[in-house]
C-alpha cells in the first residue's frame, strides 16, 4: 500500500509555489507520522496543470491519497478540481468529498444548512447589492461582522469589520467587493453576521455524515485571546491572525494573539454535541474544524463555520497542533484515523 500525499502548489513565473505547505517542518512531520504507521508514502506536488497526469498514475497502483489540497479553485489554488478528479477515477482518498467541499467553501451555504437543521448560527444577511442595507443593524442585531462569503484564515476580515451602523456596513460591502483579496478569499459576495460577544472555541470533527455513528470529536479547546487586547477586539482579523500588520497593531503586551486551553467539562460536552450536529448538517466527510462562540450574556453557543480539510500539523502554533497536544494525540494518530476512514487497514 502506497500513500500519495497530494500537496497544493501553483506555478508562478515558471516556478512552483507550495504556499505554506512546502516547508521542511511539514515534510518532517509527515515523514515521522508515516514511519510510525509503517506506511510507504510520496510527497506529490499538485498543480492545476499536472493533476490529470498524476491521477492517471495513481489509478494504476494500489494506492490511497492523503489529500491536503484546500484551495478555493481561483488563481491557481487547487482544491475542488482535485476532489472531483479523485472521485471520477474512483481513487480512495482522505478529507472532504466534492459535496462537502462545495458546501464548506461558502459560509452562506453552511449557514443555510445549519439553520435548516436547527443548529444555532449567528443571524445574518447576504449583501448582494447596496439596496437592502438600510435597517440591517436593527434587523440582524448590532454589532455586525462584515465578511466575504468565501474566505479562509480570516481573509477579508479586519478589526474595522465589526460595525454598528448601516452606513458602515454599506461602505465595507463596497470596499470588499472591489478590493484585492488574499489568495484564499473571494469577496464577490459579502454578508453581515451578528457578532457574538464572548469566548471562542474550536472542535476537530471526524467521520461521515451518512453514518452519524461514525462522527466523533476530539476534545474541544478554547481560543483564549490575549488579555491585553480590548474586549471588543477579541476575534480573528487577518492581520493579527498572520502577524502582518499594516493598519492594525499587535497585542499591546507583545504576547501572542491567542493561546489554546482546555474547556470546562460541561461546556465541552455541549461543544461536542453542537459541533457534531453542525458537521452532519453540512454533510461532513473526512474531517473538519468547527469554530464556535458563546454569548457571554446568555451562555448560548453558536457555530460560525465548519472548515473542511483544515490544516494537519503537530506544530503547537497551529489550531490542529494545539488540539492534538491537549488531546494527548500525535499527528500519526490523526492520520491513522483518517486513513482508516478511507479504507486503509492499519
What are these regions (language model features)?
Residues 47, 188-194, 201-202, 283-297:
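A short glycine-rich, hydrophobically flanked beta-strand micro-motif that places a catalytic Asp/Glu
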Residues 170-252, 262, 266, 273, ...:
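Phosphate-binding site of ATP-dependent enzymes
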Residues 1-4, 58-59, 103-198, 209-211:
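Active-site nucleotide/adenylate-binding loops and adjacent lid/helix of ATP-dependent enzymes
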Residues 24-126:
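Conserved N-proximal alpha/beta basic substrate-recognition cap immediately N-terminal to
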Residues 1-14:
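Short beta-strand segments enriched in small/hydrophobic residues
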Residues 11-27:
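Glycine- and acidic-residue-enriched helix-capping/strand-helix junction motifs
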